[in-house]
Amino acid sequence: FHTDSASQGFIAMASVPDWWHPGLELSLRGPLGRGFTLPASARRVGLVAFEDSPSRLRGLIQPALKQEAAVVLVCNFAPANLPDDVEVHPMSALQEIADWADYLACDVDRENLHRLRERLGKLNKLPAEGGTQVLIHTPVPCGGIADCGICAVRLKSDWKLACKDGPVFSWDEVG
């Protein structure tokens, strides 16, 4: 999974399949739903990858650094080619980073959402209201067109479709 910052957001894409060749016609859709919203006031940004790879969070790094924020990545497997300004901490440091951060972005697969709720629910403190956002990774086979419900996520008050209402949700909705 590759991400790279662009002037008005970021580009995210999976690896290109081997059978693709120059001149191949592609049909692309997107973007779908709602993405991360990095507050302009954020100066201490924590990126928390509950899955094996923090790749879906990488698109927040350059915008955060551009606004002179300190960036800490919390994950079990540190990726290569991170900017030198990004600190990497193990998941065991989550409490310390949550206490420090004024903005927290988390990435979790829908199947592991209960683990995230359990883990964040035990923390003494999270960034102020709206300061914690969660990317819930789930299949979106219809591309957000058919309201098929396969991407549905159970939040505190209701079911939401990741393709339209997410896939990034405020912790206030999730927790």
Please state what every model-predicted region is.
Residues 1-24:
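Ferredoxin-reductase
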Residues 10, 34-36, 169:
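Aromatic-residue hotspot detector
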Residues 14, 30, 165:
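Pocket-edge structural micro-motifs
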Residues 18-141:
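FNR/FR-type flavoprotein reductase catalytic core
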Residues 40, 144-146, 172-173:
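Solvent-exposed, flexible loop/coil residues
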Residues 137-167:
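Local cysteine-cluster metal-coordination motifs and their immediate loop/turn environment
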Residues 165-169, 173-175:
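Phosphate-binding loop/pocket of nucleotide- and phosphate-handling active sites
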